[in-house]
């Protein structure tokens, strides 16, 4: 998918990497040469994605992480020395008619789709600007 792009010596983190778009992004980034750090709540999904990446001769590291848990997220990010690319993909939807949405569902979706997305972006961007040997300050964030 990204074979014309060279991401050698780049490190990418993908949240929600166990399925769907996150899985596809993780595999594509690995095919382009990036070292990919994959996060998901579901270990079995991460293991499957990790195997696919390894078959393509890509490099990946997996972490089971609930991004709505700030302590879990910080613990994972402490283990990462460099970060160049973030695919902030973790998210969910619980389709319901607006008049039927419970407080519990609203809080769950707000925590995952807004608060967690903010926390992931903020903490990862802090890591990006602190990276050694960076020619310019920053990195790439995809939401």
Task: Describe each region flagged by the PLM.
Residues 121-122:
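A short, exposed helix-loop element centered on a Lys and neighboring polar residues
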Residues 11, 18-20:
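Conserved glycine-rich cofactor-binding loop
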Residues 97-98, 105-110:
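Substrate-binding pocket helix/loop in short-chain dehydrogenase/reductase
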Residues 1-10, 133-134:
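Flexible N-terminal pre-Rossmann segment of NAD(P)-dependent oxidoreductases
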Residues 44, 63-75, 103:
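The beta1-alpha1 cofactor-binding region of Rossmann-like NAD(H)/NADP(H)-dependent oxidoreductases
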Residues 34-48:
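Conserved glycine-rich Rossmann-like NAD(P)H-binding loop of the short-chain dehydrogenase/reductase
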Residues 89-94:
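Conserved NAD(P)H cofactor-binding loop of Rossmann-fold oxidoreductase domains
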